[in-house]
Structure formats: structure tokens, C-alpha cells
């Protein structure tokens, strides 16, 4: 029996991947001024970054409940099981809404095996979890096997973020404006990580060379079994820096694969252009 996968735009995977693998797509929402857009459908990250550089502050919101319901109903009618791997509940209300809507849909289709997972992951870390699930689907695993494996995979995923300009986090209320101002003067680059699905500060590094060196150190401390690992790199209007980071990772660890994708407008709305994020499995 076919197991259908569903994910949302916060995976930072290209739409072409969703189409190629037949994965249901749920877009988060982004607002600029009084206009609302669907992430990766009616707006893209480069448009968001241009607006941010012009002083605008985009806002994000969870996926539309009706959109979620429409996607769930689409799979309910097939009679096959479906698994929605959701963006971290610590960063969006989409998971909670999806659980509520899944219960409504299952009342209408009581035999429909629909499951919703809180990935507690973000950006391409979340994307790596979806890729892992897609591989399991191709291998013919049951929905129970896929759900168990994905939960375990997500619990082992490291997310290390850094932003180029603290101003954007300050605009969104993530840090104080004073911290952003002082950080900019001193060329301070913050490192952040995910803890229980939330983005939290890790360290502050002065200068890009030291920053990259520290990221490699953290990967050495936390990662393992690199020859069997796919490492993810997300970037925001800074592909050159992401490529430099990729070369350092290749030289230090020689992982099985490194994938790079631009950050989506939903994630980028908070972190801003210049964001760089690394994802890998911990020991």
C-alpha cells in the first residue's frame, strides 16, 4: 500500500522535489504591508530580502487551515495512508492546526490512516527529514515504520544558524536593537541552534573566519559517521559564502553528500539576507 507524504514550505526544498516525489505541499503565509502571499507559490525569498533591505518588515503566519484540509481530503479519497511531517511547533502554529484538522477529516473518513508529526525541525534540517521519509516510502516501508524512523531522525538532527546582520532579528523582536547595533559595530556573528524545536542563542563569534572555524569545530564535536551522512546547507542571498562553507565541510569530513538550497521566504522573513545554516545528524 502506498504511503503518501505531506510537508510544508519551511523545508526549504525546491518545489520540483515535491513534484518529483509526489509529496503534498502546504505553503506557509507571508505578509508584506497589507498584502498576503503563499510561500514559494506567490512570493519567493529574493522578493522578501529586497523588501527587508528597503526597510520593510515581513510577517509570517501558519498555513491556511483550508489549504491544510484540502490537501488532507485529497489523500483521504485515495484510501491510502498519509503522513504529514510538520514544521516545528516551536516556530509555527501549523502543527497544532493540522492535528485539529486531521481529527475533523478522520471523522468524515474513519478508515483513513492520517498521521501528523511535529518534526521540531526547520529549514533544510526539516527538509532532510522529509527526504529521509521519501526514501523510506520508495523502499516500501509501512506508515508505522516511516513514522517511527522519521521521529528518531528528527531527534538527532543538529541545526546551526548564523545571521550576517542582527538588524533583521531586532526588527522581528528576536533580539534588542541595542544588541544589534553593538553587534554590527564589532562585526559580531551570532551562532544559534535548535533546542526542543525552538531557535536559541549558542555563541557570539567575531569575524567570519573565526565563525566558519567554530562551525567546523562544532560539527567535529557533535557529528559522526560522515561517510553515511547527508549534510544540508541553507543560505539567504549569500551563495558564495555557503559554497565556501561547503568546501570546508568537504575537506574536513568528506560526507556522503552535501545539499545546498536557498532559504524560503517564510524562514528568511525572520533571519534576513546573509543567513547561513548547517544541518547534520549528531552522534
UniProtKB/Swiss-Prot annotation:
Entries under InterPro entries matching the protein: DegV (IPR003797), DegV_C (IPR043168), DegV_domain_contain (IPR050270)
GO MF entries: lipid binding
Positions with a binding annotation for a fatty acid: 60, 92
Binding annotation for hexadecanoate: 60, 92
Region forming the signal peptide: none
Coiled coil: none
Alphabetical list of Gene3D superfamilies matching this protein: 3.30.1180.10, 3.40.50.10170
The keyword Nucleotide-binding is annotated on this UniProt entry: no
Keywords of the record: Lipid-binding
Stretches assigned to the DegV domain: 3-282
Biological role stated in the UniProt entry: May bind long-chain fatty acids, such as palmitate, and may play a role in lipid transport or fatty acid metabolism.
PANTHER family: DEGV DOMAIN-CONTAINING PROTEIN DR_1986-RELATED, DEGV DOMAIN-CONTAINING PROTEIN YITS
The name this protein goes by in its record: DegV domain-containing protein YitS
Organism the protein comes from: Bacillus subtilis (strain 168)
